[in-house]
Amino acid sequence: TATTEIYTLSPHDALPIWGDEYEGGKLAVERIEKALEDGVNLTQETTLSGGYPKRLAKRAKEAGYYIRLYYVGLNTLSESLHRIQNRVAKGGHDIPHHDVERRFSRRFDDIAKLLPYCDEAKFFDNDNGFVLVAEYRNGELLPVGDKRPAWLLELINAIK
């Protein structure tokens, strides 16, 4: 029989264990590093901020991993903040406004740095459900369907 080992941990899931998202984040990175070392397939949810996602993608690519990126986009900072407020109201974790603003303003630069390591990427608009609006293959970003949200047009300009 075939078996699959899956490493899974969110910094937010670690709160009951560690009582601290920072410690949970460190544990998540340790597990990601272990999966990479062991050649285990993995997935990571990330804001793409900081240098770690790019460094991880580069190392994974060098180790022979096939890299897929799934990006969910929103048009405005206020949409992002509103979603965080809704999550907090339902008992989820909060993110400081200044962190959201900083990450939001750099999001396309972060994607542009990561795309060279991706074998494929799919971009979804999340204005009203998930709608596939573009795909990245063979080094090219290709619109899909008729929907062209403002953020997608910004992304296209950012990666030219």
Predicted regions, residues:
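NTP-dependent small-molecule kinase module
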Residues: 114-160
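Small/polar loops that bind or transfer phosphate-bearing groups
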Residues: 44-45, 69-73, 124
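Short, small-residue-biased leader/transition segments that mark boundaries at the very start
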Residues: 2-15
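A glycine- and Lys/Arg-enriched "phosphate-lid" helix/loop adjacent to the NTP-binding pocket
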Residues: 65-113
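Conserved nucleotide-binding/hydrolysis micro-motifs of P-loop NTPases
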Residues: 14, 49, 73-79, 128-130
